[in-house]
Amino acid sequence: MDRTETRFRKRGQITGKITTSRQPHPQNEQSPQRSTSGYPLQEVVDDEMLGPSAPGVDPSPPCRSLGWKRKREWSDESEEEPEKELAPEPEETWVVEMLCGLKMKLKQQRVSPILPEHHKDFNSQLAPGVDPSPPHRSFCWKRKMEWWDESEESLEEEPRKVLAPEPEEIWVAEMLCGLKMKLKRRRVSLVLPEHHEAFNRLLEDPVIKRFLAWDKDLRVSDKYLLAMVIAYFSRAGFPSWQYQRIHFFLALYLANDMEEDDEDSKQNIFHFLYRKNRSRIPLLRKPWFQLGHSMNPRARKNRSRIPLLRKRRFQLYRSTNPRARKNRSRIPLLRKRRFQLYRSMNSRARKNRSQIVLFQKRRFHFFCSMSCRAWVSPEELEEIQAYDPEHWVWARDRAHLS
């Protein structure tokens, strides 16, 4: 019986070796098979694993299991993934920056590699309490939209201030878009408080007071024409104390030239400037009419015969008729009387005419002192009136008369 037991034990050891080498699954290791004799084979299998393996058995160590293979595969995938996740380099394109006539200016611009997927990933990583607003409603976009609205409002307000042609010019920013800035020319008003004081001082002059009181229809001196006088004072560049009565009428005459251009109303300026001598100014366009009435009727009759006498000059010299020679001798007398009549005119009338000529010359010099800029914009006139809106001069409005 002892021999048979030893034989069965040896056979069980051999069969245990074969089963453990061919079935390396961990479930078999945890539940070792029992031999036919009923004894466990766990200790025998552990002792045999350390020795040389039988033929046909895989000699790979237990660390080369499926878990190791999966680890190697995962490491290989992790090495390949960074190559796929690298952000593509931004591409470069050429875009049109400016088109002027037939010339086109190009500039190089990079294309942004940011996609909507990146915004979605960013929003998914935000905290639960943060509002994942869409990318086009970000803070930068909102600030840009607010800035653009403010720039459009400023653009609507600025052109109203730019219309006035004023002496000095400066450059101001009209629009700022990104890194581009558009400049425009703007004139600065030179109307100072000194010019308003000089104008108010001249209003106290008795002649100017009488003139403004006479112009009840406001044909020559309404509020806009008087505001142009202040604008001309500022453009002429004279000191405030140097402006006198003549400068007031010069500026007013020039303002009527620009706006009204009514000769009859402008002649009234001479009437008040040179007192009542305007009625005595000679009418040089009708000198022959005055001379004809002042001549002797016989002389006027002989004067009508002058062309006939000139044609028959040769006959007159030979003619013995004394009446014809007597009429010819009166022709120089008519010329002398015409010269005497011209000198017998009122000396004040001739003086007033010379004053009118001098007035026109001074008006031209005053116009040149303003750099030949006589046009005044409505915006500048309103600005001048806004300096002292309660002044009695600004109540001279033609709209109130109708």
UniProtKB/Swiss-Prot annotation:
Residues 76-89 have a biased composition (Acidic residues). This is Speedy protein E2. It comes from Homo sapiens (Human). Residues 1-89 are annotated as: Disordered. Residues 16-39 have a biased composition (Polar residues). Belongs to the Speedy/Ringo family. Pfam families: Spy1 (PF11357). GO terms for molecular function: protein kinase binding.
